[in-house]
From Swiss-Prot:
Organism of provenance: Mycoplasma pneumoniae (strain ATCC 29342 / M129 / Subtype 1) (Mycoplasmoides pneumoniae)
Matching InterPro entries: DUF16
Family classification: Belongs to the UPF0134 family.
Pfam families: DUF16
Protein name as annotated: UPF0134 protein MPN_104
Length: 104
């Protein structure tokens, strides 16, 4: 680029400068568009992560509820096992009485 007293030496020099400015302008425009697209992608990813976070929280609540149900079932099973033991003892007692009656 040749500039003499604030003026370009030739129209060709001016054209080269204008072409460079046009290229830079287009580059900035393209980069600006890319930044907008990337910004939208980041927003979408953020929304997705937030939704997944909510889903995880819901699953944690479900898992906690299932854990409570399992505890209740274990308590019921233990109680049923104790009841069965009592029934078995009662049956053993009845069997002994029957055996005693039969042996007499």
């Amino acid at each position: 680029m040749v500039e003499l007293d604030g003026k370009f030496a030739t129209k060709a020099d001016l054209k080269r400068v204008e072409d460079k400015v046009d290229v830079l302008f287009e580059l900035q425009k393209t980069q600006g568009e890319q930044i907008k697209v990337q910004g939208k992608q980041i927003e979408q990813l953020t929304e997705t992560v937030q939704k997944q976070g909510e889903q995880i929280k819901e699953l944690q609540v479900q898992v906690k509820a299932q854990g409570e149900e399992i505890k209740e079932i274990k308590v019921e099973q233990k109680a049923q096992g104790q009841t069965l033991q009592l029934i078995l003892k009662a049956l053993e007692g009845i069997n002994k009485r029957l055996d005693n009656l039969e042996s007499k």
